[in-house]
Amino acid sequence: MSDPRKAQEQEPTTHFGFQDVPESQKAEKVAEVFHSVAAKYDLMNDVLSGGLHRLWKRFTIELSGVRPGNRVLDIAGGTGDLTRKFASIVGPTGEVVLADINDSMLKVGRDRLLDKGVAGNVQFVQADAEKLPFPDNHFDVVTIAFGLRNVTHKEDALRSMLRVLKPGGRLLVLEFSKPGNPLLAKVYDTYSFSFMPLAGKLITNDADSYRYLAESIRMHPDQETLKAMMVDAGFERVTYHNMTGGIVALHRGIKP
């Protein structure tokens, strides 16, 4: 008879913030975080970034090159900031799919967009970035904003994104990264591990989720490492743009 404790010991581990957890548990733990913060996610984004997240997303939209009639996949689309803008660009002949693995975030995004009259050319799909349930060569543009760091197997997710893109299609990864200036990095560390959990406690009554978010940012690959991962996954002409001193980076890659 097999010993379940030995099986757990042999299971590969991954990071959940600064903790090492069995790979099979990470998705569930991340889900708990976003179930907790979904209702006030937009408010917290504004508070924690001072509204800068709107500028970062605007630049993502500009660099995406989305045009009328395009088909766009917004992975980890959450409350629908990018989806709403993309839907207005692609128009009635195009399509935007807002995909999120977390049903609480997906519901908030769907309700928010429907309240704003965004309908007709938008679909909402609960989906795992590592195993996207879409046909090969299907989308003109795929985006993932502030979601890749929460994925357990990032390499698998990047390959899955490549698969669903049309040849010549573009992937854009907007994510927290590593500041290049040591002084800025020190200030950012203090802000992340002091102010973020405090704000989480005061606004959502959940300091732990925002402590995890700060830790997950530190564990995410830096700019050059993520660029190399995208190249290894099969993307070409991979570039990145640092924003706010490298606190955030936007990577773009093209499917051959």
Swiss-Prot record:
Transferase among keywords: yes
Classification via Pfam families: Ubie_methyltran (PF01209)
Record keywords, A-Z: Menaquinone biosynthesis, Methyltransferase, S-adenosyl-L-methionine, Transferase, Ubiquinone biosynthesis
HAMAP family: MenG_UbiE_methyltr
Taxonomy of the source species: Bacteria, Pseudomonadati, Pseudomonadota, Gammaproteobacteria, Pseudomonadales
Function: Methyltransferase required for the conversion of demethylmenaquinol (DMKH2) to menaquinol (MKH2) and the conversion of 2-polyprenyl-6-methoxy-1,4-benzoquinol (DDMQH2) to 2-polyprenyl-3-methyl-6-methoxy-1,4-benzoquinol (DMQH2).
Protein name as catalogued: Ubiquinone/menaquinone biosynthesis C-methyltransferase UbiE
Originating species: Ectopseudomonas mendocina (strain ymp)
GO biological process terms held by the UniProt record: aerobic respiration; menaquinone biosynthetic process; methylation
InterPro entries: SAM-dependent_MTases_sf (IPR029063), UbiE/COQ5_MeTrFase (IPR004033), UbiE/COQ5_MeTrFase_CS (IPR023576)
Binding site for S-adenosyl-L-methionine: 79, 100, 128-129
